[in-house]
């Protein structure tokens, strides 16, 4: 399995509009696509995005600690957050609670695209072991980040594993993590060969994807953009 980038983080939320309104008015994203089922937001359709799926509430944070976006100048980005309660645990980082348990971060680092995905932080009972298991899903090894938590890398973005209880909520906030691949068909064949637990295969208008259950019941999507993919 050879993912290219961290394509999106998908969430289940009871009301997607407050989150979509916040990220489009405060953190440089726009609505890439909206259907009856979901709203897709990002600063660039071909970079890291958030997918907000409508689902029955209330949702529980479960495995998801936070999602962090990358900016080249944090102070400038914070200027758009006037009136928002912001936590600054370390230099170059800021975190805020948005809605329905979603905690969003901003991390200062060199970036080709402002507000691209920097990292996703997950709770894990065994962070070191979980990071090791993600290598088998195509993620690359990486040194710990500023938080000191074990992490893996894909296309310059990271997944961090923080010591904590992910639980097994009936209505989790996190739907799945999605990585972009060249061929979903190859990943389907490899998943079957390796005995990975496939949750679903979806052949949609612009994408073709396979969903696999990862460690601690976090779902990973391997998604291929079809030639018809023209979202902006």
Predicted regions: what they are:
Residues 51, 160, 175-176, 221:
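Polar/charged side chains located within well-ordered beta-strands of beta-rich proteins
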Residues 21-22, 27-44, 58, 65-96, ...:
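Acidic (E/D-rich), amphipathic helical modules within compact regulatory domains
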Residues 1-4, 10-49, 76, 122-159:
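Core segments of cupin and vicinal oxygen chelate
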């Amino acid at each position: 399995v050879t993912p290219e980038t961290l394509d999106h983080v998908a969430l289940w939320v009871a009301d997607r509009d407050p989150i979509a309104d916040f990220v489009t008015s405060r953190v440089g994203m726009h609505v890439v696509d909206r259907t009856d089922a979901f709203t897709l937001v990002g600063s660039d359709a071909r970079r890291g995005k958030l997918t907000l799926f409508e689902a029955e509430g209330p949702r529980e944070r479960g495995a998801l600690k936070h999602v962090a976006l990358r900016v080249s100048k944090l102070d400038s980005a914070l200027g758009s957050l006037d009136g928002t309660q912001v936590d600054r645990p370390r230099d170059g980082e800021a975190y805020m609670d948005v809605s329905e348990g979603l905690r969003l971060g901003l991390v200062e680092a060199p970036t080709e695209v402002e507000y691209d995905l920097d990292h996703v932080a997950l709770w894990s009972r065994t962070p070191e072991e979980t990071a090791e298991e993600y290598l088998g899903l195509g993620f690359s090894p990486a040194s710990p980040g500023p938080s000191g938590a074990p992490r893996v890398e894909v296309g310059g973005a990271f997944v961090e594993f923080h010591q904590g209880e992910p639980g097994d909520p009936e209505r989790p906030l996190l739907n799945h993590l999605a990585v972009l691949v060249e061929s979903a068909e190859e990943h389907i064949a490899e998943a079957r060969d390796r005995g990975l637990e496939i949750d679903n295969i979806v052949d949609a208008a612009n994408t073709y994807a396979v969903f696999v259950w990862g460690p601690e019941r976090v779902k990973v999507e391997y998604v291929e953009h079809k030639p018809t993919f023209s979202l902006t």
